[in-house]
Amino acid sequence: MTMRVTFLGTSGAVPTTQRNTSSIFVNRDGDYLLFDCGEGTQRQMMRYGTGFAIDHLFVTHLHGDHVLGIPGLLQTWDFNERERAIAIHTPAGTRGNIKQLIQANGTTPSFPVRINEVSAGDVVLDRSEYEIRAIETAHRCASVGYVLDEDDRKGKFDREKAEEEFGIPPGPKYSKLHRGEAVEHEGETIQPEAVVGPARPGRRFVYTGDTLPTESVIEASEDADLLVHDATFAEDRKERAKATAHSTAREAADVARQAGASTLALTHISTRYAASADELVDEARDAFDGEVVLAEDGMERRVEFPDADEY
């Protein structure tokens, strides 16, 4: 089961020659999900080969650098004769704004556009193996972040124990036991828990959008495998970050550290650091012992299982 995250736009409010405005594409085992859609997102999708087969767009807030790509993307789908519905998930109270944004294009899409208002704590998308929840963030307007949480996986099957202790040869009985079914072998009933370990956690991906550092994000990011956090400024601009309801790279790292995240990706990088964002990375690494990466447009990250070393 793959989970790949492609950064389509990693700049702050203004794009640069190297960074587009905010957008992240997630491929979760063939489910294609888009988080935010800044101006030019559809070109980034073409450039980095993600494809356009998304059915769900998750909006963190309505600032232009996160939504101005929506009309163009809808228009392209229309030109390509899309028929499937698209669901746009947006913070509570912003449905009308999304409608106005779409109508400003002067055309009505020929396919269904479903606008779903969400609040912190809502399960926005519920799938058989994962769910996406909205989480509380702190910005200058109605805003949410999103958490993709996978269900627990089956425990690890102990082949050595099955064969050596119970004498069960490799074959169909292994599959049954791993599915949680008891099997009969040489007159003995073998229960699955005898050879299958405890359930193993799935993966957790967190995207904050624009936010101050908050306790709600720390709680939602507990043991996250990948936390993508606002890191607009360096620490010497901390007051500016606070005034504009953003985070510094060190503050993002503090969130990751307190949450016990594995990897922190810094995004929403101010144009102030267009030449080099090394100080953001350095400050984050000073505060967080896990992996720190500076998100770049076109960067792809594979989100591994917490126990990937066991495979």
UniProtKB/Swiss-Prot annotation:
Its EC number is 3.1.26.11. Its cofactor is Zn(2+). Keywords: Endonuclease, Hydrolase, Metal-binding, Nuclease, tRNA processing, Zinc. Pfam families: Lactamase_B. The active site is at residue 65. SMART domains: Lactamase_B. The keyword tRNA processing applies. Transmembrane segments: none annotated. Zn(2+) 2 binds at residues 65-66, 210, 268. InterPro entries: Metallo-B-lactamas, RibonucZ/Hydroxyglut_hydro, RNase_Z/BN. It is an enzyme of class 3 (hydrolase). One of its GO terms (molecular function) is 3'-tRNA processing endoribonuclease activity. It catalyses: Endonucleolytic cleavage of RNA, removing extra 3' nucleotides from tRNA precursor, generating 3' termini of tRNAs. A 3'-hydroxy group is left at the tRNA terminus and a 5'-phosphoryl group is left at the trailer molecule. Binds 2 Zn(2+) ions. Belongs to the RNase Z family. Homodimer. Zinc phosphodiesterase, which displays some tRNA 3'-processing endonuclease activity. Probably involved in tRNA maturation, by removing a 3'-trailer from precursor tRNA. This is Ribonuclease Z. The gene is rnz.
